[in-house]
C-alpha cells in the first residue's frame, strides 16, 4: 500500500529533513512550499538580518514565508547534487524530483550559492562536499 504522502519528516545529518516514504519517480511533484506571501522588499530586509531562513523568492514582487511548521517542505535540505528542484507553476512553488528517489533517501534541493554563503557559516557540508 502506498503512503498518503510520498515523504516523511525525519532526522538528517543537519537536523530534520524530508525523506522519501516510498520510491519517487523522476519528474514527479513531491511537495508544495507553502506559507504567507510577503512583499519581496520586506523579505530582503529580513534576509539581510538573517531573521528568517525559510524565505523563498518566487518573483521580484513576492516571496513565500515558509516558516510555519505546517509547511513540511521547509524541511527539504540543501545538497550541491540534489535529487529535486523548485519549480514555479501557476503561482505555486513545487519541489519536483530531478531523478528517481529511492524510499528512505533524503529529498534535497540546491539552495544556491548566495543562500549557502549567507546562512552556512562553515560553508557547504552536504554529502557531496563533506565536512571541511
Regions found by a protein language model. Give the residues of each.
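Catalytic cores of histone-lysine modification enzymes
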Residues: 1-86
